[in-house]
Amino acid sequence: MKRLWQHCHAATLRNGKYSIVEDAVLVTDGPLIHWIGPRAELPPGDYAERIDLGGAWLTPGLIDCHTHAVFGGNRSGEFEQRLEGVSYAEIATAGGGIASTVRATREASEEELLASARKRLDPLLRDGVTALEIKSGYGLDLASEAKMLRVIRRLGEQLPATVRSTCLAAHALPPEYAGRADDYIGHVCTTILPALAKEGLVDAVDAFCEHLAFSPAQVERVFIAARELGLPVKLHAEQLSSLHGSSLAARYQALSADHLEYMTEEDARAMGAAGTVAVLLPGAFYLLRETRLPPIDALRRHGVAMAVASDLNPGTSPALSLRLMLNMACTLFRLTPEEALAGVTLHAARALGLEASHGSLEAGKLADFVAWEIERPAELAYWLGGDLPKRVIRHAEEVYRG
């Protein structure tokens, strides 16, 4: 069934630019975009329905390409500790941080994890998100990682959004493997990943390359195991120190390397050559009160696509608004509003391997878009909060109206 969506303007995000169409018309056919362009150039046709968007601005549906939205408990107590001067690394060394969330997640039932995740994802979806990634990594044993990934699959079935699942079993060292990181990585590679892949629970594989997590050599073992299973990889890299994990990610044609505050010019060059997306996470930077900025100019010089994500997690970025991350990416990291919007649409789609179907308003792609009550696209990165979406459309069907 063809529908004609009219009386609007569009920022299509073709090629990562605004690519604005004034007085636009968008035609959908079933779940897909059939045509988009100026009203004056609309081809003749019959339409089952004509929808008046009342002068709204259209953008692609927003994509949150890095979240840890499934977890037990919360870490508001650690938030207080950090404000008193205790560092993230000190909290982790004392058994807090990821380890405390692992305990709570292992204890939670699948139904409890599902209910709590739905509650925290609802604000993101009402904010215009139509696709997102959710990582495991708070189970750190086969049963608990499988539990998390089953919840993620169920969220994909229940939510009006595309949900990609990423196995992050190499997130931290579980207590039962204390002092035996190599043994745990072996367990991840030979037992956890193959079992989860066999169950069809994994779309991609991630790891945390950092002094307080896993070394580049250990991460490479995970990447090799993922490659043998036919799974793409991504990496938490260069958040707290420089281990050149982003160069390692590029060597394995990773979908993305994320955080990147301590990446070097050499790392940026490698990522640009490999086509690996840089996922910027300003929420974690802000909450940890970091001072070292990702090298945005180096990423620009080497043509690295930059995505922006919420990093929704209980410890370092309890962020429930992707639009707030747009403002932070501009204000803290000095992205332009155009770069930031591309970062939560086309480049975020690339970071999830979804660019063929998501991320821009083009014929043949899914009709996932948002109608905003704004006067120009830069407002999406300008306003701090507020209910801007007028309508959220997924697969040409309205899923939210403001």
Curated annotation (Swiss-Prot):
Keywords: Cytoplasm, Histidine metabolism, Hydrolase, Iron, Metal-binding, Zinc
UniProt key word NAD: no
EC number: 3.5.2.7
Pfam family name, one: Amidohydro_1
Localisation: Cytoplasm
GO CC, any one term: cytoplasm
Pathway: Amino-acid degradation; L-histidine degradation into L-glutamate; N-formimidoyl-L-glutamate from L-histidine: step 3/3
Gene3D superfamilies according to UniProt: Metal-dependent hydrolases, Urease, subunit C, domain 1
Record: residues binding Fe(3+): 66, 68, 236, 311
CC cofactor note: Binds 1 zinc or iron ion per subunit.
MF-aspect GO terms: imidazolonepropionase activity; iron ion binding; zinc ion binding
Residues that, per the record, bind N-formimidoyl-L-glutamate: 138, 313, 315
Family: Belongs to the metallo-dependent hydrolases superfamily. HutI family.
Annotated function: Catalyzes the hydrolytic cleavage of the carbon-nitrogen bond in imidazolone-5-propanoate to yield N-formimidoyl-L-glutamate. It is the third step in the universal histidine degradation pathway.
This protein's name: Imidazolonepropionase
Underlying gene: hutI
